[in-house]
Amino acid sequence: MDSCCVSVNNKTHFNDSTSSSDAADVLIHSTRAGRDEIQDKSQNKVNIYIRRLSDSEHVHSADERRTEIPPVNLPTASDTAGPEEPLAGIKSNQFAGLFGKTSRKEKSKAQSTIMQTEQLKSKGEDVQISTFSADGRGVVSAALRKRSQGAPIRRNVTVQVLDQDRSQTPAGVQPDPAFPLGDPGTSASVAAITAATLAATAPLMKAQSEMEAQISRVSAELKRLQAAEGSVPPGRTARTDSSSAGRAAHLEEQLNILIQQRLQHLETIQCQQIQLQNRLLGSALDVVASRGNSSGVSQTDSLPLQISGNRSIRLSATDNPSAGRPASVSMDVYRERQTGGHKSPLETPAPRKVIPKPTHWTSSTSTNRPPKSSFKNQGNGRLQDQSPNNRRSPERCALQSVGVERFAMATADNSQPEQSRESQMPSKASVTRSAQEDGSSFVNGQNEQERQGEPTNVSSSSTTVQKASEMLQDLGRLKNEMRSLLQTADAFPVPNAKSTQSSRSRHLAPVATAPPPATAPISMPPEPVDVIAVRAAALNRASVLKSIQPPTSMFEDAGLVLRQVRQSKKTLEENLEAILRAKDGEVLHTQLEALSKNRDVREELRIKKTVDAWINTLSKEIQDDLARESSERIVDAAVSRREAGQRTRAEASAAAKKTSVRAQAGNTRAHTRQPAPAVRNKPAVKQEATQPIVLKSQDDEEYLARLYGKAIYDGQRRTLKKSPYLRFNSPTPKSKPQRPKIVETVKGVKMKSSKTQTSQYVGDVSAMQHSVSEPHFIFSPSDPDKQQQQPGSPVRGYLIPMAIPLGKPRVDCQPPVPSRVIITDKPAIVTTSFPPITVVESKPTPAIRKPNAILLEVQSAPKKRTPQLQIQVQPGVNIESALCSSRQASPTPVIPAESILPPPSIHATEDPHAHEDQQENIFPGTNFLAQADISQETNGGLPDSPIEFKGLPSPPADLYHGPVFPPVPTQSTPLTEPILNTIQQRETLENRLVDWVEQQIMARVITGMFPQPAQADPVHQSEPENSVASDIVEAAGGSGLQLFVDTGVPVDSEVIRHYVNEVLTEIIASMLGQREAQGTPATLVQTQDAQKEDTTVPTPAPTPEPSLKDPPSPVRTPDLSEHLSTATSPEKPPQESASPGPDRIPVGTPITTPIPSPTRVATPSPPTPANQSPEPGSLQIHLWEGSELPLEEEEQPELQPAPVVISVPRVDDQEESVIHPSSPVLSKPQSPPAPPLPPVIQKSESSSSSSSSSSESSCSSSVTVTETETAARHISEGELLLNHGQMAAVRVLEQEGVLLPNFMTSLNGSLHGVQDMDYDPPSEGQVIRAPHLPAHHDPVLSLLARMELGPISQSQQPEGWWEEESSGEVSEGQRPVLTAAEEIVLTGHSLMDQQTIRQSRNTQISPHATLTSPGQVIAEHTGAVVEDGGLSVNLRSSDEQKEAMVYQADTVSSPQPESSQMAQTVHRPAPILVRQYEEEPDFPQLRRLSDDAFFGADEKGEDTFLHTGEGGGGGRGSDVRVMSVRLPSVKQDQESVSLSSVEGDTDSSANDVF
């Protein structure tokens, strides 16, 4: 607010801060401008300091309202008179105050003018004069928002004409205490004039500031010119000195003249404005004063009205024509609002007004009692606010103030001139004081104005300011005089003399501090009738004087502050009380609930006793009622009706008793946690019959109303109101109060359970007890079950189910009662009520409870039970027990047994307590619950009683089913869930089946389409796909693609084929799994051609990646070439046949082209020999999952490497060839598995790879597979290879020392998984380069044998391999096609020729080139535990090995290309026997060298049983040490040499398991 600074003095005034701590105060404080800020304001900006005129604070409101326009308004005056300058601000403030409180008419005018002026000023300086009444808090908040946004606040300032005194002060400076402050016309005119004056002065001020700025600029320019002239060269200076000096002098003269003229003009304009203001104020005051004087008493009468109505704003303007001083208008919000506001609330209690005012008038009491009145006023009018009170008071004041104001007028008229003068003199301070007095911080206001005056001192209007300040001081004197007079007048009503002097002293000093007295005159004058009103009038006038009076004693200020504080405190306390009452109600309810839940056992017992007594009394009544009802209706209908009627009677009797009892014991207990039980007992008694229910609802309502003080709701509506019962509320209470009561009970339990649950539950229990004869039984069974559910307690059992279905309970209200009372008559109703309870607690009930009425109707009406007596008896018992059982998930059959009424009735009596205790089982209620349960059991045990009552146990069962009917939906809901689940499962299965069938069909279609492409090339599946695409294009070109062709775009058959191939490939991959779909064609082509062509191709996998898995297995198969056989065993030929495996270049190491040794097929049982070459096929088979064709093709393409697998360059093949002679692999274990595996391709491949560890060894270089009969042994140890179910495969695995557990875990087959479970150290694809990774060589071989796959590097095929035999499982690099050397390394030593392998190994292994097959363990690492495998590798002596079925794992190392720099030593894994060989092998040298090289080259090595041949040809392995190691998954990709083709063959999964 650059242009307009609204500073609100924080000075607390009795009316300002404390009495009205509202948005207005906030606005004032928030908008308050610091004095420093005020001083800093530029003169071109108009600073208006606004004090909120609290509606009740009329005394200080004028001062508060003082809007100071310090620098611009009075620039000259401020300059001339700094101290008086605040007066100028005060004047403006007074002006603002004058037009701040105007009549509505005047307000409209003033608003228009003010708005205009503000708009004018907003262009330059925004002058915002805001007057906020305590009433319009919303407006204040809006204003605050606007101000916070910085937008100028255009607020209409309503000026309260405080007194005629002001109007008289201009002429006679006589403030009429009774002058009609609120004359609408006068106040409006004054406001309009003031607004006009402000609007006129603002431009002048702005012009003055602008002129000053221009002058400063001209002077600065002159100085600059002078400086420039000084800098002129001497010659030119000499020339120009004279001219320039003349020009400068001329300019200076002109400037001086201009400045003087401008200043004179501004001063003239300012003087004119001041005079104008004085005239306006004087005229307004004169009008008011003339009215006040002329009208005399009538004016005094009107004044209180207007004053109070207008909020009694006093304008005290001393118009001294001689002095020409601007009349200082002091706007005072009359204390009238404080006092009047106090009165307004207190006006109702006049004595209070009298009391506080006399105290106020008394110097000692004046400060104190006004606060009391203000407290009472605000307290009573807390909602009313002081301002409305004042407005109210104005009327009374108008009446009362007539006499008071007359009296005050006489005194005021006498003293007004002086007071006005005094007030004028202090008006400088008075304006500040008015704020100070109002804010009870006189010093602060003065300081602010003084500071504000300081900037005005700079202005040239200081003289005017001084004059204005003098006039204000005069006005202040007059105000003081008038205050004293008014105070004396006010004092007269009570203590006139004391009040006069004390009021003078206080009003002189505390006039500001005692706004209540000042306000009282204003607000009181409207009440001339009362002496208090007279006092109020005097006080109001005093407040006017007060506002004028700047010097109020600090004590008076303190008194005002205290009063304000008291008033605000009162208001706050009342508000707090209201809030606390609301909260206390809630707390009370919660406490009552807690008490009901936590009541002591003693209390419960006592309550139960009381309840039992009531039940006994009520039971008789109920029985009578039941008999009556039975006679009226059928036995049940009549009984229910009679119960309703007699229950009403019983309620009358019991109501008196229960009412007294509840009022006494019930209410006390409610506070002591017992009242709820008492209430419950009573309602239980009432609920015994249909009427007991009504009694319960009525009593509960009354009791709750007493306890909670909630009489707001009708008992019925109250309960219904909370819940959906409202529907039934109006009808049920009218037609059948019993039914609504029932509803209330049901919902009351729920709804009240949170608040009044205890009482209601107690009522339910008592009702149960009362209906013990018949209904009790029903309630008792339901109670134990329902105890958990208070609503479901006996009352719940009956009433709740009934209450929940309110609509039907109206019709069926009696049946539930008969169910309680008369078992025979309305079992359906009872059942219905209970089932709802059951439903509520157990399953769908919550919804059912609401419809319970409906259910009740349906069940009661249909009930389908011809024998009503029987039906009611059993259903009632059954229902409650059933409800309990249903809650307990007990079947309905329990109900018939429970149908026995007598024990239930007894228990029912207990049950109410149980229900009371239901909330807390700790209390005897738990015992009652147990008893209730017992009663239910008794009912079950005593089916006779229900039979006796109803005579037919079977009908009760039907009835029970009927009542169950409502719960049936609840059950149906739980049933629906399982049904839905089953349906969903079925649908899911069906969908999966459909998908599977579709996939199978697609697979067949694709296979039919792909067999040719599959044959085309394993690597070049794209070719077969293209052929297929061509076919597709041909087929689709005509029709299938007709749409595309029809588009008019020429169709390219090749493009179509390409897209079709891609789509088919994707579909096939998704359908068959990319592994299978790609594997089959890849395997066919690859197996045939890949051996020759693919040896170099790393992974010519068919488009689907799964083919990658295939090649590793075929690679391993070729890896087992005879070259290895040369090293260790005759099986070398099978290994050589497997050597086509080198075509499995996919093996991580470049595939050496070992001579494929078809002889490897020697042992069909361990398909390894066949597998080694077929392994690619077998891998492909894995892709195709069960097709044996790949196996056949494997045999054919043994020479054909499976290109699909990532193949290392043929260097591997060379390595294989190099390595093959090192260790031939047993052909038998290799060959046998291959044919058997077709059914289980993965397993067979694994078995072949494992069984033909030799085959792997052949692929990896040389693997000696020694077939030993210990295979069975190893199978047991390492788990049998169940892939083919062939002992040969198992033998091969055992011989290989492959750990079957790896296969089991890795293989998809359950058997494989079982076997592998025990030993699963390395992950499938892992290659153990480091010693910690060594894995059993045997597991790899066993995997190969099982899988019937050529040895595949374990690292590459472990995951997919064991899961699916398709080669696709093997990730590229895990199981690339292995060279013979690689396969040997991976496969490990064949059991067949361990010694030979050792020899070859010794010869071939170079310390750096030697690689331990994944199964091998380096001697250095003996005793090392394979981390991946999780198995400890223990190297033991050959003796121990023999003990444990010693298997010599021959490590065959063939020198491999330096690129790989890894001699793959194939260690025949030691027997998979659990035993670990402790002896340290002599092979640490060989195997250590090999392992070092192997591990160094391979990141992961597979631990294997390293058996140094005892008589090893190598010679080094003189000591045969078996190291049982789990093969960690080998990463063949990392190693050029496939570390464990054996493990890989077995299934990379096995390695993964390891």
Curated annotation (Swiss-Prot):
Q: Name one GO biological process term.
A: smoothened signaling pathway
Q: Which sequence ranges form a coiled-coil region, renumbered to this chain?
A: 204-270, 556-586
Q: Name one Pfam family in it.
A: TALPID3
Q: Name one GO cellular component term.
A: ciliary basal body
Report biased composition (Polar residues) as residue ranges. Answer: 312-321, 360-391, 412-447, 454-466, 1080-1089, 1535-1554
Null mutant phenotype reads: Homozygous for these mutant alleles complete embryogenesis normally, but manifest a cystic kidney phenotype during the early larval stages and die within a month of hatching. Elimination of maternally derived talpid3 activity by germline replacement resulted in embryonic lethality of talpid3 homozygotes. The phenotype of such maternal and zygotic mutant show absence of primary and motile cilia as well as aberrant Hedgehog signaling.
> What name does the UniProt record give this protein?
Protein TALPID3
From which source organism is this entry? Answer: Danio rerio
